Amino acid sequence: MNFLAHLHLAHLADSSLSGNLLADFVRGNPATHYPPDVVEGIYMHRRIDAMTDNLPEVREAREWFRHETRRVAPITLDVMWDHFLSRHWTQISPDFPLQSFIGYAHAQVATILPDSPPRFVNLNDYLWSEKWLERYRDMDFIQNVLNGMANRRPRLDALRDSWYDLDAHYDALEERFWHFYPRMMAQAARKAL
């Protein structure tokens, strides 16, 4: 899962949206630096990442990547799941329009920015102002996201080419998304994530 899915599942679970978004920027035990609700959100994010990586649908999808891009498949797939969530938001969350949800999420996350790592603050500067969460529905933007990550982290250069794997297996990936994401939503609503 990437930003949008983590925020969405956190909302369904009444968890800290701030903690769920911040988690990738926090190493080790967060309890000494953040309030309990944010810490719980960080741990929820970590549980979701571990669970998602082990879902049969996700393990199967990783095998569709070419040898040269398979190493970065988990990262690429996380971005792709956000694409499908953004694209199908009106079906997935008909009572909470995407624009309204994004405004709500932004307001929640903004409360922790003064005490956040600089890299997280920098991400937030772009995430909201450049409307990444809305733009995830556009495959050209997904390609830009993957290229941007490859540019920032040269050891992940294969992300650039992984877009072709997404394109080649688009329909099958979308089908897998519909297999597992509604289950995760139900688990979040039951606070079982």
UniProtKB/Swiss-Prot annotation:
The keyword Kinase does not apply. GO terms for molecular function: [acyl-carrier-protein] phosphodiesterase activity. Signal peptide: none annotated. The keyword Hydrolase applies. HAMAP family: AcpH (MF_01950). NCBIfam families: PRK10045.1. This is Acyl carrier protein phosphodiesterase. The gene is acpH.
